[in-house]
A protein has these predicted regions:
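Core dinuclear metal-dependent hydrolase active-site scaffold
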Residues: 1-50, 108-155
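Cap/insert and terminal regions of metallo-dependent hydrolase folds
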Residues: 38-111
């Protein structure tokens, strides 16, 4: 975090970029869009081969601008099976699809192990096909509204 006064507790999440030889990994924890934008505005190089997608792939994180700046070849979403909150959100999945990132999700694949020798990145599982990972956007919107007092996602 760059500030000491965030409105959302998740924006206090630690964001770490790890570089090993020619491979780079960006771990965003539960950071949400406010933190993402703060990082981009700081001018730090966020480009990474692998992105651990923020806040379980929620629409409140991983903005299009942030994902485009990171431009990952691989994206890992850590999320529970049949998440009550409807995560990951379709908008985040679409953003990752649009940049061509290979997708790995813990709810679909279980434990994901990533290995790097500094040149190549290897996974213990095969990447998912995007059509199989999509969930109806309306169901996400309904869950969000139910959890946030009737407010729309865009609010």
């Amino acid at each position: 975090p760059n500030s000491s006064g965030y409105n959302r507790i998740n924006d206090y999440s630690i964001v770490i970029k790890y570089v090993y030889k020619n491979n780079s990994f960006l771990f965003t924890g539960d950071a949400e869009e406010y933190s993402d934008m703060e990082i981009l505005e700081s001018g730090k190089n966020v480009k990474a081969d692998l992105l651990k997608v923020g806040h379980h792939g929620s629409c409140t994180s991983s903005s299009e601008r942030f994902i485009n700046a990171v431009s990952p070849k691989y994206a890992v979403i850590s999320v529970g099976w049949y998440s009550f909150y409807g995560q990951p959100d379709r908008c985040v999945l679409d953003r990752l699809y649009n940049i061509g990132a290979k997708l790995y999700r813990t709810d679909k694949l279980g434990t994901i192990i990533v290995k790097s020798n500094g040149e190549d990145i290897q996974f213990n599982k095969e990447a998912l096909d995007y059509p199989e990972t999509k969930i109806p956007y309306t169901s996400v919107r309904l869950k969000y509204r139910a959890l946030h007092g009737g407010k729309n996602i865009e609010s």
